[in-house]
């Protein structure tokens, strides 16, 4: 019996053109986005929030939360969900949908980080203190996250 060859999405697409598409998408909609393979490797991304790039993804504890949240969304896709919306463990919202090729789940497209209501600044101030972030800078970064009711 022949093993089914796992499709590598990054071999199927022109990655620089995909990157340009993701940048345009982010600019038009005002939302960060990414395409990740099923192993969680980022193929293309644009518009990430400074709360994530300057705080969450650089602190070991909050970065672990990011990875756990990404994994939870990706697992929803492997269980056959058409899409998933998830509040990450750092308090932000991400959405994802699977990319299928010839019936095989090969990657996920993510939109986010965003909020569905004005940020709970006390929650984020507490989080800043908990993880040693500069509270003023962190709250300023959180305040820039798009709200999509």
Language-model features: locations:
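Juxtadomain coupling helices with adjacent low-complexity linkers
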Residues: 1-29, 107-149
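Structured interaction and signal-relay segments at domain junctions
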Residues: 2-91
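Sensory/regulatory domains in signal-transduction proteins
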Residues: 68-129, 147-148
């Amino acid at each position: 019996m022949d093993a089914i060859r796992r499709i590598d999405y990054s071999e199927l697409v022109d990655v620089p053109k995909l990157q340009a598409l993701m940048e345009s998408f982010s600019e038009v909609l005002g939302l960060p986005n990414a395409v990740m393979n099923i192993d969680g490797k980022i193929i293309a991304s644009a518009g990430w929030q400074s709360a994530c790039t300057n705080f969450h993804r650089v602190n070991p504890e909050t970065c672990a939360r990011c990875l756990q949240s990404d994994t939870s969304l990706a697992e929803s896709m492997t269980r056959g969900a058409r899409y998933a919306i998830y509040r990450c463990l750092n308090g932000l919202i991400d959405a994802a949908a699977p990319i299928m090729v010839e019936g095989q789940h090969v990657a996920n497209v993510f939109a986010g980080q965003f909020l569905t209501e004005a940020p709970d600044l006390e929650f984020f101030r507490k989080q800043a203190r908990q993880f040693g972030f500069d509270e003023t800078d962190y709250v300023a970064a959180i305040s820039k996250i798009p709200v999509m009711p």
